[in-house]
Design a protein with these regions (language model features):
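Core residues of bacterial helix-turn-helix
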Residues: 29-30, 41, 48, 69
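Alpha-helical linker/hinge and terminal dimerization helices associated
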Residues: 47-48, 69-90
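Interdomain hinge and pocket-entrance segments immediately C-terminal to HTH DNA-binding domains
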Residues: 87-106
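A short LG(V/I)-centered, amphipathic sequence patch enriched
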Residues: 45-62
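Short alpha-helical "packing" element that flanks the helix-turn-helix/winged-helix DNA-binding module
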Residues: 10-17, 69
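Short helix-boundary/capping micro-motifs
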Residues: 16-31
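Short helix/strand-capping hinge loops at secondary-structure junctions
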Residues: 20-22, 48, 56, 111
């Protein structure tokens, strides 16, 4: 049985917050409010059953769970960006050039 995916927005918020160790900077990067980032992190923490950050007066620190998952998330997002770039590329047309005598081209090749 397939395991359900975690919410992508929550994972994006977590990865950005982990990189910046700051909800406000993560929010700026994602063009959302710091409250929205905090809400997504709380949702993710509820789903995984434990804290991803230790919230301190001087900032955020990753828990062991948070620290161990960040490299995998970064790799996953890099792969998604690569796949997105590949899908956005216009398809390359394969072009074949042939050279034939003009009489052969007009009487035999072009009618086909």
């Amino acid at each position: 049985m397939a395991r359900p995916l975690l919410p992508l927005n929550a994972l994006r918020a977590f990865e950005a917050a982990a990189r910046h160790l700051n909800f406000s900077r993560a929010a700026d990067e994602l063009s959302v409010t710091p409250g929205a980032v905090s809400q997504q992190i709380r949702l993710l923490e509820d789903i995984v059953g434990g804290p991803l950050f230790v919230r301190e007066a001087r900032g955020l620190q990753l828990t062991d769970l948070g620290r161990s998952s960040v490299p995998l998330l970064r790799e996953g997002f890099e792969r998604l960006m690569d796949a997105s770039a590949l899908l956005r590329e216009p398809p390359r047309r394969k072009q074949v050039s042939i050279s034939v005598a003009p009489g052969f081209a007009s009487k035999w090749l072009m009618p086909r």
